[in-house]
Structures are given as C-alpha cells and as structure tokens.
Regions:
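Active-site and adjacent substrate-binding regions of carbohydrate-active enzymes
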Residues: 1-242
Length: 242
C-alpha cells in the first residue's frame, strides 16, 4: 500500500498485468462424490465446523452435486436427495442442522420438496416481495407468502440482502412478469445491476445492490423492511452489508 502511493495508475496497471500474467483460475471445483476420500473430507469438515460451535451448516448449490452423462445436472432425482440424506447422516453425528441452498422459480415448488423432506430452506422470495410491497403500496403477495409458510409449516431462514444479491428468478410464478420488471427497473434505476442466469441471455437471475440502495437509501423503508423480516416466519439472517 505504501509503494502504490507513489505510483501512477498506469504503473499500477503494469504491476497487476505482470502479476496476473500466465495465471489460471480454476473457479469452483467439482468433487467426486463417489470417492471415499471425498466423504472423509465431508466428515472432517462437518466435525471441524461443529468444533467451532456451528449449529447450522449451509450447503451451497447442493443441487448441482450429483452429475450423470445425459442428465440435466440440476436437481437430478433421486441422486440429489440420496446425496442430501447421506450428508445429513454425517451432520447428525455432530448435532448439526443442514440448510440446503437452491435458487429456482416459485412455480417449480422446489422449496416444498426440501421442506417436505424435513430440511430448512432459504426464503429467497422475501427480499423481492418486500421491495414490491413497499414500492407498489400493495402487500397482498407478501401477506399470501407469509400465510403459505405458516399453513404448510415450512421452516425457513430469511434475509433481505446477501452476497448473491437480491433474487429475481425465484419470484417467477409468485409475482407477475410486469411486477418483476417494475422491481428490476426500480432497483437498476437506483444503481443496481442485473445478472442473467448463467449461459442464458435476457433471463434474469438476480439484481446486485445493497438492500438499502435498492430501497432508494430511504431510512424509513429500510427500518420497515427489517421489521418485516424479523417478524416473518423463519429465522432471520442479518447480512452486514444490507
């Protein structure tokens, strides 16, 4: 940091280019779930997390794990559920609760599948529903969602913002396309950036913005949004960059 104080932007760029030359990035790595070594790794990881005091463990993008040639390789059945059950047996040894993470449209009802098998699920619908309600002045969809969670006894972890941004894909089938587009236009107009579904153009996935920015940096709206989150069914997750 001290050195860069005396460097021009062009000089800094040359240093970065030099450091990055020839570097290759692996990205997210698939693990061979058929290997005993991988399951030994999973067991050790869960044991370590429990030793640090963890109670709930998020399984990031778990639905992509079981892959087979010729399959869609997203939520393959029964492979996905068999894998999840195998991980749960490991987690039970250490008194850990699993939180499977999955993004899919409301209409696909994957959240019901997860809940029906006895797992907690992320409420990725709530962030968009609150923005829709506050900006449109119509809270019916938010009310109906809260009612559904209670009536179907779905146990969730909810949030406003998160490191993935504000979910959009999840809202398909819950809000009309017009209302989703209005939400997108509102947040983008306040500095947000829409990320499309991987490999597809013009298929919205999420909008990147802090929740405070998405609400127009309005303190009253942010306070109300947080109150709604805290009193919704489910465990509230407070993200430090909301």
């Amino acid at each position: 940091a001290e050195v860069t104080r005396f460097m021009s932007d062009e000089e800094k760029k040359k240093v970065v280019d030099y450091m990055e030359a020839g570097r290759r990035y692996l990205g997210q790595m698939d693990l061979n779930i058929k290997s005993p070594l991988v399951w030994e790794f999973y067991d050790n990881t869960l044991k370590t997390l429990a030793g640090y005091g963890a109670k709930i463990v998020r399984l990031d993008a778990f639905a992509y794990a079981p892959k087979e040639p010729g399959e869609k390789n997203f939520l393959n059945e029964p492979g996905t559920w068999d894998l999840l059950e195998k991980v749960r047996k490991l987690a039970d040894k250490y008194n850990l609760t699993l939180l499977p993470e999955i993004h899919a449209s409301y209409g696909e009802k994957n959240y019901e599948q997860i809940a029906g098998k006895g797992y907690m699920t992320y409420d990725f619908f709530l962030p968009g529903l609150i923005i829709d309600a506050l900006e449109s002045g119509d809270g019916k969809h938010l009310f109906d969602w809260a009612k559904e969670l209670i009536e179907k006894d779905i146990h969730t972890v909810n949030m406003l913002g998160c490191h993935d941004g504000i979910p959009l894909l999840d809202l398909k089938g819950l809000l009309s396309e017009e209302r989703i587009q209005n939400l997108i236009d509102t947040v983008v107009g306040r500095g947000g950036y829409v990320k499309d579904l991987h490999g597809q153009k013009n298929m919205y996935y999420q909008v990147n913005a802090t929740y405070y920015s998405a609400l127009g940096e309005d303190d009253a709206k942010m306070l109300l949004a947080r109150a709604l989150q805290l009193f919704m069914p489910g465990k509230p997750q407070i993200w430090y960059l909301d």
